[in-house]
Amino acid sequence: MAASCPCGSNRTYALCCKIAHKHHANVITPEQLMRSRYSAHVLGLVDYVVNTYHPSCHAEEQREGIAESIENDWCKLEVVKAEVGSNENEGFVEFNAYFDEDGKRYCMTERSRFVKEDGLWYYIDGTFPEDEPEPDPRLNQSVSSLKVGRNDPCICGSGKKFKKCCG
């Protein structure tokens, strides 16, 4: 029986990411590039990962760090959402990638941005939701139940203490 693709597409590797790994030009969507890059991590294909970064990223200079990230024990990929960007040459893919390290399971969540240039899709950058600050839970309270301490930051967003601003 043929091996299933590491990207979790439920297709065989030969009919899925191997096509992209053989020739970058075979990638036709940002999601396909993201899945093939994940599979390249699983399979240890450092060159493919480096070559599918956008040239402006100078990934060759970061080859050692990329190789280290590939050494993780990648377990599972979940594509959360794929969407078109501001035009047909930009796309975003949000995903969860699970890996084991030092006997613990971790989940990396990223919203990756891809751009198409000269007919080829490239990874250019990504944002990590855990890097974004958590919203203040008081912002979700109804006005009637809002409790603000006198020394808390003002709810108007001025940065002043509540007692010196709107309090």
UniProtKB/Swiss-Prot annotation:
InterPro entries: NTF2-like_dom_sf (IPR032710), SEC_C_motif (IPR004027), UPF0225 (IPR023006), YchJ-like_M (IPR048469). Signal peptide: none annotated. Gene3D superfamilies: 3.10.450.50. It comes from the Bacteria. NCBIfam families: PRK01617.1, PRK02250.1. Belongs to the UPF0225 family. This is UPF0225 protein VV1_2912. It comes from Vibrio vulnificus (strain CMCP6).
